[in-house]
């Protein structure tokens, strides 16, 4: 397959010749320019890179996490360099890029995330709807940030007994679409702010009519259930603690029962409670798994309890709701995609200032959404479940596509896009259908003969002396 190469004039400026089709499909330059104008973030001088390209650069920081700050920009222009008339293409230094990021600020990336990241699944998307409702899930995580005084002061460190987390951490709570793994809203806070405080903010502003939100037991409350039903015309399915909502008012045909809740200052809401156990042999094997350090040891006889605002057992049978709640683990996989495969687990966020940390987080979410959007388009084209496409393979394909899009002429872009969509679902890379699997919540820890690093244990530099000057014989 032969493609035409784009032609550049000798007067072309880098800012206008660069093209990011992989990103621009969802973040078109017109939209980014509009947000830059609204946030007064264009800057007085254009310099080597205008702020439009700085926005794309911030998103690319998460797509190419293995590269340092300056190398990310070099990677973005690697295709264009072969067409550039001047062989000595000078690019901004890492310090200059950080300066431009400070000028850009956080609002532009936040508004771009809010405008772009919406639920993407259609009625034809496999696994995206149940009971006529769009499946959503909410969950939180802690992300490590660069160990600087500013980050430590703003975000803080988690502690357990005598031990403190080695790096400052930021609390992130996400609302994601289950079928596509698209994160559609997020809130960030210092690490000591609990998920229970952040989740209501996320639910009140992001949940839309026709959604079924899957929640863990730490988030669900009578107030949230009332708000979802009466104010947002949405529904919830959540796990319950052992002593919650145990006074049955009416037992239904499938064994579930109804309870009326009266949250303070809000309308009463009727909910349905479902109880079930795991088959004894499997439950005993699961009980042998080590539990996390923050949870109780599992009991093989444990009674599992769910609560939902779907009251009709004919419309939503209890067994189907139990199967549906199992889909909440998709948001765990979604968080793993961005922490492990995009951000490369074990490495903190790059930014050394709180404002730039928030900017980087929005860039990370946009990068994850863009990867997932391309995967969803490819899966729908072939009538596949998006779960069958490999996320790591998709990141590699889009990495290569950034180079190819920069080389080809504009009239060739539709053909390159079709090849990209086909590459994403290459048969050899497709994942098998999901299987029922259980794994203990354990991690491998690297052994080290060295002492744990404490706060304040820093090295020092002798700027005016060499090793020869301090040597005594």
What do the predicted segments below correspond to?
Residues 77-87:
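Extended, structured, electrostatic nucleic-acid-contact surfaces
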Residues 118-125:
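A short, well-structured juxtamembrane/interface segment
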Residues 85-106:
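Major-groove recognition helix of helix-turn-helix-like DNA-binding domains
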Residues 1-75, 102-104, 111-115, 131-134, ...:
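Single, function-defining residue in the core of a domain
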């Amino acid at each position: 397959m032969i493609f035409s190469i784009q032609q550049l004039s000798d007067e072309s400026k880098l800012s206008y010749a660069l093209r990011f089709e992989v990103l621009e499909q969802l973040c078109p330059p017109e939209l980014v320019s509009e947000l830059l104008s609204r946030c007064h973030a264009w800057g007085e001088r254009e310099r080597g890179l205008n702020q439009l390209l700085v926005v794309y650069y911030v998103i690319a920081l998460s797509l190419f996490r293995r590269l340092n700050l300056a190398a990310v920009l070099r990677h973005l222009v690697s295709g264009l360099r072969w067409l550039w008339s001047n062989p000595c293409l000078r690019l901004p230094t890492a310090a200059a890029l950080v300066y431009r990021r400070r000028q850009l600020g956080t609002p532009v990336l936040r508004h771009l995330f809010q405008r772009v990241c919406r639920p993407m699944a259609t009625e034809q998307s496999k696994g995206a709807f149940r009971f006529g409702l769009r499946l959503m899930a909410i969950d939180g995580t802690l992300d490590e940030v660069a160990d600087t005084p500013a980050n430590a002061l703003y975000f803080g460190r988690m502690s357990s007994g005598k031990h403190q987390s080695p790096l400052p951490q930021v609390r992130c709570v996400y609302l994601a679409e289950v079928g596509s793994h698209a994160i559609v809203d997020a809130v960030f806070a210092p690490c000591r702010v609990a998920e229970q405080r952040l989740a209501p903010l996320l639910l009140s502003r992001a949940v839309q009519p026709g959604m079924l939100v899957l929640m863990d037991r730490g988030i669900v409350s009578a107030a949230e259930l009332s708000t979802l039903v009466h104010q947002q015309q949405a529904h919830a399915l959540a796990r319950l603690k052992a002593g919650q909502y145990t006074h049955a008012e009416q037992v239904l045909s499938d064994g579930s029962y109804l309870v009326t809740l009266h949250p303070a200052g809000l309308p009463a809401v009727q909910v349905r409670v479902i109880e079930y156990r795991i088959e004894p042999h499997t439950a005993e094997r699961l009980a042998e798994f080590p539990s996390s350090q923050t949870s109780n040891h599992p009991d093989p006889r444990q009674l599992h309890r769910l609560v939902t605002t779907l009251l009709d057992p004919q419309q939503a049978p209890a067994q189907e709701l139990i199967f549906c709640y199992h889909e909440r683990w998709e948001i765990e996989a979604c968080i793993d995609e961005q922490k492990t495969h995009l951000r490369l687990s074990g490495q903190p966020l790059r930014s050394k200032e709180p404002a730039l940390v928030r900017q980087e987080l929005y860039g990370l979410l946009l990068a994850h959404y863009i990867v997932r959007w391309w995967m969803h388009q490819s899966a729908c084209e072939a009538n596949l479940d998006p779960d069958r496409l490999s996320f790591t393979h998709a990141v590699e394909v889009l990495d290569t596509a950034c180079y190819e899009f920069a080389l080809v002429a504009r009239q060739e872009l539709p053909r390159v896009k079709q090849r990209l969509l086909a590459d994403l679902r290459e048969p050899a890379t497709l994942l098998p259908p999901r299987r029922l699997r259980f794994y203990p919540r354990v991690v491998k820890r690297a052994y080290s003969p060295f002492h744990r690093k404490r706060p304040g244990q820093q090295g020092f530099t002798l700027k005016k002396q060499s090793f020869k000057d301090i040597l005594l014989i």
